[in-house]
A protein has these predicted regions:
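Extended catalytic cores of very large enzyme megasubunits
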Residues: 1-472
Length: 472
């Protein structure tokens, strides 16, 4: 147990940290540092640590005036002196080596973060974690230099997360709609950088841009009671300061590493793109226009750190007739290769590699080529692939009867195959290259609450744990 130092605290109430912050003075920390050093050399002695801490305090009082605030470095120098003067050379050596080790860690963190001094948040994260933050998440200027600290990162994310709560405030929100259709006033978010606050947290231009976007959405739903000008005026009056606690709560969750959001949120919240979702699905229709539009949309999503799932089953099979040119189609797998190359290009410039889920229905004429598409892991390296097993496939498997493959362009059968051989091929390829996976159309849609209104689900996110309709 630590001794009660309240009677010997002297006139020191504050201490200056290396980053310039002034915090309450705690002699117990001096005692603990000495005790750990003694423990490191096999001479753990709590009473000795307490006695030496008192000597350090006494020396500090003699060397420092009442008007001065002692520094961490100054106190640590005195600890070394006291340890040596009192004959505890082994403990002094351990303490000195520990100081040196900590100094080396601080220097490396300063270099990684491009800072002169690390702060209390930098101390929460080890060197490897800070390297990841610096490489992926901290904002940089056009020269690639870091212009944001981890503390600033977590603050901008926490503020962004809290913004929607403002719109559900009783003074703002009209749940059942029917509110006046307010004019969407012009607002240049760049001119109001850091001009509005929620408590101590200032809103940057990208927070304000997100705020205006949310406001417009609620106005279109007729759920906002006040005009945009009145809404901003509430900031000036400090009305929204009550949401500061929500920001602090989320901020503390992140810096304590109890919870960290996904990459898009860390990169984009309070930043240019603003996108926080990681999982998307896009539709692909049987036309070159649709395919290229989807390719462009996927590239934009990858740029912001998201991933995309697609079902390529609407694309006509390889060799099928193309009316506009009189030629033949290249098939879904060749177009998947185009998406794969695009993903490879984007991943070199983005915050992380892109991720794709390519799905093909089991009754597509190119299903056998699809199953073998990742054989030897030589192609489609930026894709997970899965076969959507249709209910008829299992019926044919059980009854050992031919399974029809359907041309998606005409809706007519063009070939029959042995379903059991197809299943064997699928199982072998999953063993050989861990691809493809399987999705069960009947099970997915058996519990789909939107089946009657929106139809079946036939696509998933890149990791396949989230079932989504196209363009979700």
């Amino acid at each position: 147990m630590r001794n009660n130092y309240s009677k010997i605290r002297g006139y020191f109430k504050l201490i200056r940290k290396r980053d310039g912050r002034v915090v309450p003075f705690d002699i117990g920390k001096i005692e603990q540092a000495i005790f750990k050093a003694s423990q490191a050399v096999g001479e753990a002695n709590r009473p000795l640590a307490q006695d030496l801490a008192k000597k350090v305090l006494s020396r500090l009082e003699k060397k420092t005036s009442k008007q001065e605030i002692p520094t961490v470095e100054g106190i640590q120098d005195i600890v070394e002196q006291i340890l040596i003067e009192t004959g505890h050379a082994k403990i002094a050596k351990a303490y000195i080596l520990y100081r040196q080790h900590r100094a080396e860690i601080r220097a490396e963190k300063q270099q990684i973060l491009n800072k002169k001094e690390i702060d209390e948040i930098d101390k929460h994260f080890d060197i490897n974690a800070l390297r990841v933050l610096a490489a992926r998440y901290l904002r940089k200027d056009d020269q690639g230099k870091i212009i944001e600290s981890p503390k600033e990162l977590f603050e901008r994310v926490a503020v962004h997360v809290a913004l929607p709560s403002l719109f559900y405030d009783s003074k703002i929100y009209q749940k059942r709609g029917g509110a006046p259709l307010h004019l969407i006033e012009k607002f240049d978010h760049r001119k109001f950088e850091n001009k509005f606050s929620i408590g101590k947290f200032k809103l940057n231009q990208f927070h304000l841009e997100a705020l205006k976007s949310l406001y417009s959405r609620f106005v279109n739903n007729r759920q906002i009671k006040v005009s945009w000008s009145a809404f901003l005026n509430l900031f000036k009056k400090g009305y929204f300061d009550k949401y500061e606690a929500e920001i602090v709560e989320y901020y503390k969750l992140m810096i304590s590493r109890q919870f960290l959001p996904n990459t898009p949120a860390l990169v984009n919240f309070g930043n240019v793109l603003g996108m926080g979702s990681a999982c998307f699905t896009l539709d692909i229709k049987d036309s070159i226009e649709s395919i290229m539009d989807t390719l462009k949309a996927a590239a934009i999503i990858f740029k912001a750190g998201g991933g995309v799932g697609y079902n390529f089953s609407k694309v006509r099979p390889e060799g099928d007739y193309v009316k506009s040119t009189g030629g033949s189609a290249s098939g879904p797998i060749s177009f998947m290769s185009m998406f794969d190359v695009m993903t490879d290009v984007i991943k070199h410039g983005g915050v992380r590699r892109g991720a794709n889920m390519g799905i093909l229905d089991s009754d597509h004429p190119d299903i056998e080529k699809f199953i073998k598409a990742k054989e030897g892991n030589k192609t489609l390296r930026n894709f997970n692939i899965s076969v959507m097993l249709m209910p008829e496939f299992w019926d044919c498997c059980k009854q050992n009867k031919p399974y029809s493959l359907i041309n998606p362009r005409t809706g007519k059968p063009i070939q029959e195959i042995d379903p059991r051989k197809l299943l064997d091929m699928l199982v072998y390829q999953a063993w050989e290259s861990a691809e493809p996976g399987v999705l069960f159309f009947d099970r997915i849609n058996e519990f789909n609450p939107f089946y009657k209104s929106l139809g079946p689900i036939y696509s998933t996110n890149p990791c396949s744990e989230v079932l989504l309709y196209p363009n979700e």
